[in-house]
Amino acid sequence: MYKLQWNKIGVVAPQEGYEKNIGTAGLLKGVIDNKLVFGGGANFPGGLPVDGGTKVTHKDIYLYEIKDNEHVLLDQIQHDYPIAYGPSANYKDKLYYIANKDESSSDILELTIKNNKLNINIIGAIPLTVENTIAEVYNNKLYFGIGSINGKNTKELYSYDLETKTFEVETEFPGELRSQALSYVYNDSLIVYGGGAAETYSDGYKYVFKEKIWTKLADVIVDNYEYSLLGADWCKLNEDELLVIGGFDKDVWKDAVSKLSTLTGEEHAKYRDAYFRRPVEDFRWNKHELVYNLKNNTWTKLDEINFEAPCGHALLSTDAHIYSIMGEIKPAVRSPYIHQAKK
């Protein structure tokens, strides 16, 4: 059984025009040539929303290399416009990202590295807005969907042909409507887990690309406890296992969504104010290291992380290490840190 030793190895560099980085959530994220690529995301530089703070989305994209447990910034560039909450997909030596360009269209970005410098090419556009969906590349097609398309959650999974630049609806997801699900390609199949809407979801499904068939997978239940994967991220632990970190507490989430959507007037304002001022521990976000065995379709857990449980972070896997990068640690409060664990 794995024992992961987590170390805080640094703070992400400030965005252009800022004195320091307070952290962002909803990141562009991936690994190219064993180097970390992440950026964009959103935060609240002016403080909590109940104190007048407003959400700011950022343009900065970072290229980091980790040498001797030291984080080395190789490159920092700005995209043409701010990006956040779009899906990322690693494929070979490239990273794909779907970026909302305006209120009716998105660009498909292709990120590469040359001479330790980031390059961004816009390789296509689609007449849809895409947020908090999944994305994976298989057989030169970028699959995306099962999340917010044009502002509404959809079960549709689209495929975008990277060669012909055409896209179509591939299939319909069999689970409930949701956003922020997790995805992974394994043995010619698409694995989809979690996400949420008014409630969190712990169910999983497998889509076999060639047969175009969905099957149900094991729910995220360990020691008789059902874990929420909403807001969590996962990455490759080894050839047959994925590591999951973070995620909202299912009961706290459901209660908050219910009250914020049903209370009115002074009661709503009072609850909202108290909600954002709660201490981190009151939100009970998941600190357990969950492990999904792709081969056996089983869930287990290792230990607990030794830092605040994140949501909307980047969990990235290189050859030898795993990195948890930024994210939020409670609603509207972010973390600027990079944490590292050896596999």
Question: Where are the regions a protein language model picked out?
Answer:
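Kelch-like beta-propeller repeat domains
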Residues: 1-343
